[in-house]
Amino acid sequence: DEYKQKAKELIKHHFDHIRTFTKDLFTLFEEKVVLAQGELISTGMMNLYLNECGINSVLIPALDYMRTDKNAEPDPVYIKEKLIKLLDGHKDADLFITQGYICRNAYGEIDNLQRGGSDYSASLIGAAIGAEEIQIWTDIDGMHNNDPRIVEKTSPVRHLHFEEAAELAYFGAKILHPTCILPAKLNNIPVRLLNTMQPEAPGTMISNMTEKGKIKAVAAKDNITSIKIKSGRMLLATGFLRKVFEIFENYQTPIDMVTTSEVGVSVTIDNRKHLEEIVDDLKKYGTVTVDEDMVIVCVVGDLEWDNVGFEARIVQAMKDVPVRMISYGGSNYNVCLLYTSPSPRD
């Protein structure tokens, strides 16, 4: 009854706080505060439950140590300093509980990490404390060699290099956000992806090790837009590519693939929010052609240039598909192909 009463008081406290926002203008600040309440309530409830079970758990509020800088990027120095100090204050604890996703910004306001959610929090925490391993539990047995929502009878990939995992995450593997890999990679901490529904399954281990000369997986990214700028007059001029890329930067639109020729530049994007404005600005430099509903297929593995034959095998596998662009060389871990299709399943 004691813990049940504490849980009721916890929920009431947070709901009363949310109700205060109904009396004033609802701004972006209030929205972020409301979004944080789920993490705050669930972790508080879990901590009470564990205490009731006799486990000496301690709740460490993420809002006391997780902070972003003025560029909305995590501040690893601040996070490490504050978190270690908080942990040192509870040396007798059996278990620590904290929130994912939420943080404070550089001005002390409640905010969130925006990308990667709780997985990003786990990676940042693991890096801050120098963990032996970071575990991320999901509803699937690690990263698969194909998207199980599209391809039947896929199988988990047991080992991936940090770069391979980042490529798969960026090009369609929904199990992990590419941002989550970086803190672990910078601190050389292995990341293990495990399945909550099958805790005995080995999952996927992500580290700085790779299996040489092996293709690991294929990912697909749909709803891609291809933009081609054709300009024989401007292409060889100094600074032409910089000017083209600056247009995309001005509209905060990331580029997925780039290819160049003597008379043109082709790029792909997956964010069409500012497509019209981007095209208008690009027309200053040449003729612009836009193709929508494209798909990027990304083949990931140890694809260094001295591993002869991989590129030919990949292209041969796509012999019946009209490939529009091929990107290879920017990374030793992927080959990307662009083609027209209504869906990656096709």
Indicate where each model-derived feature is located.
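Nucleotide/pyrophosphate-binding catalytic subdomain
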Residues: 1-176, 181, 333
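Conserved glycine-bearing catalytic or ligand-binding loops at nucleotide- and phosphate-handling centers
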Residues: 173-178, 183-187, 191-201
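A glycine- and small/hydrophobic-rich beta-loop-beta segment
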Residues: 191, 197-290
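Intrinsic, low-complexity N-terminal interaction/targeting segments
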Residues: 212-219, 242, 276-320, 325-327
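Short, hydrophobic beta-strand segments
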Residues: 225-231, 294-303, 335
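A generic structural motif
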Residues: 263-270, 296-297, 333-338
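Conserved small/polar residues in nucleotide/adenosyl-binding loops
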Residues: 339-346
